[in-house]
Amino acid sequence: MIAHLRGELVTAGADWVVIDVAGVGYRCLVPASTRSRLPAQGAAVQLYTYLQVREDALTLYGFLTQAEYDLFELLLRVDGVGPKVALAVLSTTDPAAFRRAVAFEDLDAICRVPGIGRKTAQRLVLELKDKIGAVPAGGGGVPDGLPVAVAPAGDAWAEASEALIALGYSRGEAAAALARVRAEAGEAPSVETLVRLALKQLYRG
């Protein structure tokens, strides 16, 4: 079992990274929450990792925080929930907010995650409510939807997110699309560039 990787960030795509550890490059699939907070290429980085073993493939998933890793692993224990849905959860919300949604049986909030319908949301609540532990501090009420993963810093990113929301996309969809275009957008993109690139991602589904 590969528990974590610590090394140099070699390259990164929309939902994956390659980390060089002692001359060996490890390719990890990552959620938007991790992708949007990665350092620059060439910098040192550490990811908590989950290795999925199948007959035809070995797939490594990486997360910046232990909380993200723990939630990913917990989600995979739910019948019918695979890595794709688990990554979608972490790409559109933070672990504490998702745990609150489960604790308060907020099905509407859970269903806002791409790939999760009503039946899956009900199954998540049924199977996870007794496993998530105490509701995190500050979770005194039912959340008004799930807060999205932190977007890259900069006013242009925030303005682009609001522009996408104004076009009818959810806050989670906007955050996930913007996270996927970070590498392509460059260091100081304009709002127009960010919106255009994000819309391409959203149109692709």
From Swiss-Prot:
The segments labelled Flexible linker in the record are 144-153
The record ties this protein, via CDD domains, to: UBA_RuvA_C
Q: What is its main location?
A: cytoplasm
Q: Name one GO cellular component term.
A: Holliday junction resolvase complex
Superkingdom as given in the UniProt entry: Bacteria
Report the sequence similarity comment from the record.
Belongs to the RuvA family.
Cite the record's note on assembly. Homotetramer. Forms an RuvA(8)-RuvB(12)-Holliday junction (HJ) complex. HJ DNA is sandwiched between 2 RuvA tetramers; dsDNA enters through RuvA and exits via RuvB. An RuvB hexamer assembles on each DNA strand where it exits the tetramer. Each RuvB hexamer is contacted by two RuvA subunits (via domain III) on 2 adjacent RuvB subunits; this complex drives branch migration. In the full resolvosome a probable DNA-RuvA(4)-RuvB(12)-RuvC(2) complex forms which resolves the HJ.
Q: What is the UniProt domain comment for this protein? A: Has three domains with a flexible linker between the domains II and III and assumes an 'L' shape. Domain III is highly mobile and contacts RuvB.
Name by which UniProt lists this protein: Holliday junction branch migration complex subunit RuvA
State the encoding gene.
ruvA
